[in-house]
């Protein structure tokens, strides 16, 4: 049950409440960015655990990654430092009272009273924006740069693009997605209640199994997985990315209407008809055979 996430939340709380621990964490980050091999190796071990967990969980939903780009590699490869030097040359920066490197983004329509972007901590270690800029500079030379972000990251992405414009570099395009909501509120937030995907998937299997038991005498785990995971995926994917998904299990597992079980059932029926036909299906349809108004209307509805 996602032990790494539980451990992270526990440790993060302790660090937030203990100034000494916070300083130790910052020291480790400093060593990481300055190429300490021991720290880098320990860091990689933790990242690998997280990545393997993601791959395992998402493979159950038939979701696969083509390639991984590690944010941390931009730290010890010094690419964040290179990006910072380029930004220094623009002259559009200052150091605040905490000695943090701050990019001045005046002149860009960002909808901020004070359009600035903080890039480093007071000790010089990088923050997320600097790493994202370094990544954008690198990936921007290798084709299209499209990022997928939560809708609450729109301003942040505009700030990153403003920095890239200052450097006269290619900006990144973004696809924004909204939140998945349950009856009790957001499914996932940085703070507060979090529903893990792993738990959400377990709930899908449980509810699909219950639904099948009510309909059929015999069921198997494979059928429950196909229907449960299908309901989960389709229930989210059928909604436009920019709209909130109001996820309701009763609707998602309904065998009637615009749902995954209905589509799966229709597919099974069609497959059964084709199997009984016992002939080779034509590769191209001959629409000249449709000589009645009703047939044409039916085809239009099926293709809509």
Report the location of each language-model feature.
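NTP-dependent nucleotidyl-transfer catalytic core
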Residues: 1-304
């Amino acid at each position: 049950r996602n032990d790494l996430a539980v451990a992270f939340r526990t440790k993060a709380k302790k660090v937030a409440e203990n100034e000494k621990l916070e300083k130790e964490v910052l020291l480790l980050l400093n060593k990481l960015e300055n190429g300490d091999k021991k720290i880098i190796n320990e860091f990689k071990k933790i990242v690998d655990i997280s990545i393997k967990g993601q791959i395992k969980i998402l493979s159950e939903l038939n979701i696969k990654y083509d390639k991984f780009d590690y944010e941390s590699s931009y730290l010890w490869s010094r690419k964040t430092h290179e990006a910072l030097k380029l930004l220094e040359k623009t002259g559009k920066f200052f150091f605040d009272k905490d000695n943090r490197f701050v990019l001045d983004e005046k002149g860009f329509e960002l909808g901020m009273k004070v359009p600035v972007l903080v890039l480093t901590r007071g000790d010089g270690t990088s923050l997320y924006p600097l790493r994202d800029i370094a990544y954008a500079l690198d990936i921007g030379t290798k084709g299209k740069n499209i990022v997928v972000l939560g809708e609450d990251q729109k301003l942040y992405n505009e700030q990153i693009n403003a920095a890239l414009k200052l450097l006269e570099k290619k900006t990144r395009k973004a696809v924004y997605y909204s939140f998945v909501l349950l009856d009790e509120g957001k499914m996932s937030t940085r703070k507060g209640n979090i529903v893990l995907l792993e738990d959400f998937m377990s709930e899908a299997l449980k509810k699909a199994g219950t639904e099948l038991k009510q309909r059929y005498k015999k069921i198997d785990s494979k059928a429950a997985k196909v229907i449960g995971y299908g309901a989960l995926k389709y229930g989210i994917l059928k909604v436009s990315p920019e709209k909130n998904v109001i996820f309701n299990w009763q609707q998602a597992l309904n065998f009637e209407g615009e749902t995954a079980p209905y589509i799966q059932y229709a597919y099974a029926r069609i497959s059964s008809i084709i199997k009984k036909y016992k002939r080779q299906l034509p590769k191209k349809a001959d629409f000249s055979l449709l000589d009645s108004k009703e047939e044409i209307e039916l085809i239009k509805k099926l293709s809509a």
